[in-house]
Amino acid sequence: MSKIIGIDLGTTNSAVAVLEGGEAKIIPNPEGARTTPSVVGFKNGERQVGEVAKRAAITNPNTISSIKRHMGTNYKETIEGKDYSPQEISAIILQYLKSYAEDYLGETVDKAVITVPAYFNDAQRQATKDAGKIAGLEVERIINEPTAAALAYGMDKTETDQTILVFDLGGGTFDVSILELGDGVFEVHSTAGDNELGGDDFDKKIIDYLVAEFKKDNGIDLSQDKMALQRLKDAAEKAKKDLSGVTSTQISLPFITAGEAGPLHLEVTLTRAKFDELTHDLVERTIAPTRQALKDANLSASDIDQVILVGGSTRIPAVQETIKKELGKEPHKGVNPDEVVAMGAAIQGGVITGDVKDVVLLDVTPLSLGIETMGGVMTTLIERNTTIPTSKSQTFSTAADNQPAVDIHVLQGERPMAKDNKTLGRFQLADIPPAPRGIPQIEVSFDIDKNGIVTVRAKDLGTGKEQNIVIKSSSGLTDEEIEKMVQDAEANAEEDKKNKENAELRNNADQLVFTVDKTLKELEGKVEEEEVKKAEAARDELQEALKGENFDAIKEKTDSLNEIVQNLSVKLYEQAAAEQQAAGGAEGQEAPQNDDVVDAEFEEVNDDDKENK
């Protein structure tokens, strides 16, 4: 079975890992980094991904970051006149991860395990699966990030039973999961979280502070200047990271904007104390989900054996201090918070292929599932933190006499009223025979698969008539849309490959022109004038072709010039060899004299030896 890669598709950074020799290994990207910024840029029809796109963001307005925050919504990014869904942008990132994983492994990769925040709802999970499909990946499993982290942490610790709490604060989402580890079984007891809390929010607090300080000093609102805002974003992220290691950092942005008197510069010293003050409310928001997860698992803080920190934002000292204070124990720091999720996904890939044995993963659904019933109430069929895969059925009836159809409004959430929860979808069971209200028996069944994706079925028990749907939110893509996006992605990949080949061809041609100029100088007076003119003419033709975009012509002229230069080089070597031979002949004539000299020296040495004796 071909390898299944593990992908952590993050809000700010992504990573890819693979199982090799029974161990999960992070695959470095072409720049040598172990994580890749989840940033996509479009410039003159070309796509840039990762660090390149992030660096260019200051000058390129067509740059998209933190797209994960829009997964499962109707959000669209319009770039160069084309609308992109979050799934398409995520697919571009996945395609890039896939391509460098293939380069590393030396084989085609078409299967992956992709992680999502534990608190992702059905629409967000479905969108992630669609993104994988668009990128040309068969998504073997969608698993929760904290669960993946626990897998990576606990692979070599399965002989001892322990309860672990995974505290996962990433770039855009926050999750807490509590798991039981023992005898190769990783069982999730509870999960809680906040999909609107992450490192991006900490950055924004710094940005808002810098904007306010600058406005106070200069009367100019930098938030209205896109380029200045991008520079502030980069500076805020850097300052946040710096303050994890030092207590004070200098934010210096020269020429941030211009006032009436000329250029203006931003110079601010940000202390860790000030940063903690600015972000206090964000850190506090991690406490409620932590307590909720403990409550749902029927555990207290003292029952937790180990606290695992996941996600780059857990490096923030105030976050570490808060979790330590809340749970009364020092968090475990033996795993890399940026890499552990992708490694866990790779291990899950190994479980699927059979390379990892005696490991069982029991995950849970993060949110309750149900339908709307009379009075706009949500009736729950599957409670949150139910182990998946699972299915549950319940029988309902009609609300009016002779009701011909039943509308099934599928919901996900914890609020008692339907309107306050997330709508996953709607469908209708029609052709119910006329009968008084309360008589027809309508069985509604929910089925959640191992990826946490929901299928709902409604059946009229009287007639046996049945209707079912795999839930897709209003933002979900149709099979036709996904297929079109797959084709677009493949075409773009082909185009990207062609662009790369053309760039290499142009570079090689430029290099050849340079080499020819150098060679012709060396050949001056050594080969016939006619040969030189022929080479110069071919070189000029290639230079002319390089001014245009006809790559077939560039290739043809390059090949032609190459052939001429090779012939010239052969002649040069032949000439050099002839000269060397002539020189060798001259040396041969002097050889006897040389022999005499050598003999004389030899005699002298012998005489000396005799004297010494």
Swiss-Prot record:
Inducing stimuli: By stress conditions e.g. heat shock.
Q: Which InterPro entries match?
A: ATPase_NBD, Chaperone_DnaK, Heat_shock_70_CS, HSP70_C_sf, HSP70_peptide-bd_sf, Hsp_70_fam
Please list the residue ranges that the record marks as compositionally biased, kind Low complexity: 578-591
Q: Name one GO molecular function term.
A: ATP binding
Q: Which residues carry this modification: Phosphothreonine?
A: 173
The entry's keywords: ATP-binding, Chaperone, Nucleotide-binding, Phosphoprotein, Stress response
Pfam families with a match to the protein in the record: HSP70
From the UniProt entry, list the residue stretches annotated as the region Disordered. Answer: 578-613
> In what ranges is there compositional bias, type Acidic residues?
596-613
Q: Could you say which protein family the record assigns here?
A: Belongs to the heat shock protein 70 family.
Q: What does this protein do?
A: Acts as a chaperone.
Q: What is this protein called?
A: Chaperone protein DnaK
- Origin species, per record, is Listeria innocua serovar 6a (strain ATCC BAA-680 / CLIP 11262)
Tell me the classification of the organism that encodes this protein. Bacteria, Bacillati, Bacillota, Bacilli, Bacillales
